[in-house]
Design a protein with these regions (language model features):
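Extracytosolic ligand-binding ectodomains
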Residues: 2-11, 25-384
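Repetitive helical segments and hydrophobic/amphipathic motifs
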Residues: 13-15
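Sec/Tat signal peptide C-region and signal peptidase I cleavage site
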Residues: 19-25
Length: 384
């Protein structure tokens, strides 16, 4: 090596040592972590959420990052186990997470959010369970609607559009299903609909013959199905097998792409309220849907779209604050309205409340010919 080359290397090394803290920080990526269900009963939801986040990260980085810094995403599998989820959140925090996405299942996020609260790390989740944002954490934020906002819309459709007076409710006995059951039963009562059968099932349940017999024996004019995706498909198939020809109504999980894929023709005719759909008549959602299919060779469901939106919610808050301050970003999100005109990646205008819940448009959907068809776009609950 020549003397001249040694001198150049020494000069470069010295320059790196004396790089200003500001310039050094600017060169570092923003670390975000997906702590999600990639195996176990939550694998469908977690994989979709993760995929949406990764696609958004790719798009954000391609457009220059956030305040000039790129995003770096790390994936962690909770195995749909709340204890593992909590341990992985601690690891992500120790590894320098600026923000954490997930878990998606309500039971896991209820346990793990204590750690993001302790460490003051913004934590985004697609979980719909009403209890998720009722724990008092100022660092928890939804990327989709809570059951408290969704169920009144579903109940109104059942009462006013379907003219149902008596209904059976089929729900999963976990931290997603129980508060969802409470929310829909309360909302149905408000609209004068009587619940004539209130039937609990287990997470991961394979055989739905006995619960469906109870539904049929109750004298219900319709059934409201509130289960996770795989169980929803099994319940729908069993309803058709037993000759049920009355309305099958539900919320977002029942209307998901996974249910259509697993239930096949049995899913046709299923109706209900969906807080998000990849088939929404919204230009930005259609663009992301096409990108998603091109990237992964499968269509997104509601969790895929919500994962994508979540990254842009974080981006909008950081840019509003103007610096990489986790506490300031969390404070900014509370009460913040993010408009598509200002941040197209958020896809729909959205407003956060003081608990981290959001309000925005949602959809009435019917599955026809193996595809979800949007029948009506519903305004934010605050505008009803």
């Amino acid at each position: 090596m020549t003397f001249k080359r040694r001198a150049m290397i020494a000069t470069a090394a010295a320059s790196a040592l004396f790089l200003s803290p500001q310039l050094w920080a600017q060169a570092q990526p923003i670390k975000i972590f997906n702590v999600v269900e990639l195996s176990g009963t939550g694998a469908t939801a977690g994989t979709m959420f993760k995929s949406g986040i990764e696609l958004a990260v790719k798009d954000v980085n391609a457009s220059g990052g956030i305040l000039g810094r790129k995003l770096e995403v790390t994936n962690m599998d909770t195995q749909t186990n709340p204890g593992i989820a909590k341990a992985l959140v601690v690891r992500a925090i120790d590894d320098g997470a600026f923000a954490i996405f997930g878990p998606v299942f309500s039971g896991s996020i209820l346990i793990s959010q204590t750690e993001t609260r302790r460490a003051e790390v913004p934590n985004f989740t697609a979980a719909a369970g009403a209890l998720v944002t009722q724990q008092g954490s100022p660092y928890i934020f939804r990327t989709g609607l809570t059951q408290v906002n969704s169920m009144p819309k579903a109940a109104r459709y059942i009462a006013r559009n379907l003219k149902i007076k008596k209904i059976a409710v089929l729900f999963v006995n976990n931290d997603f299903g129980k508060p969802g059951r409470d929310a829909i039963v309360g909302a149905l009562k408000t609209f004068g609909v009587e619940v004539v059968a209130d039937i609990s099932t287990e997470a991961g349940q394979l055989d739905f013959s006995a619960p469906i017999i109870k539904v049929k024996q109750a004298g219900a004019e319709a059934v409201f199905v509130y289960l996770n995706e795989e169980e929803s498909a099994r319940a729908v198939r069993e309803l058709r097998k037993q000759g049920w020809d009355k309305p099958i109504v539900g919320d977002v999980t029942l209307l998901s792409q996974k249910v259509i894929d697993l239930a096949g023709d049995a899913a046709n005719g299923v109706v209900g309220h969906s807080e998000m759909s990849a088939d929404a008549p919204i230009a930005g959602v259609k663009v992301v849907r096409d990108k998603f299919f091109k990237e992964y060779n499968f269509l997104p469901d509601h969790n895929g779209i919500k994962g994508y939106q979540g990254v842009y919610m974080l981006k909008a808050a950081i840019q509003k604050v103007g610096k990489f301050d986790r506490v300031a970003v969390a404070k900014q999100l509370h009460g913040m309205t993010i408009k598509v005109a200002d941040e197209p990646g958020v896809l729909m205008d959205v407003t956060f409340d003081d608990k981290g819940d959001i309000d925005r448009e949602s959809f009435l959907i019917e599955i026809k010919g193996g595809k979800p068809v949007v029948k009506e776009v519903l305004p934010p609950l605050g505008k009803n």
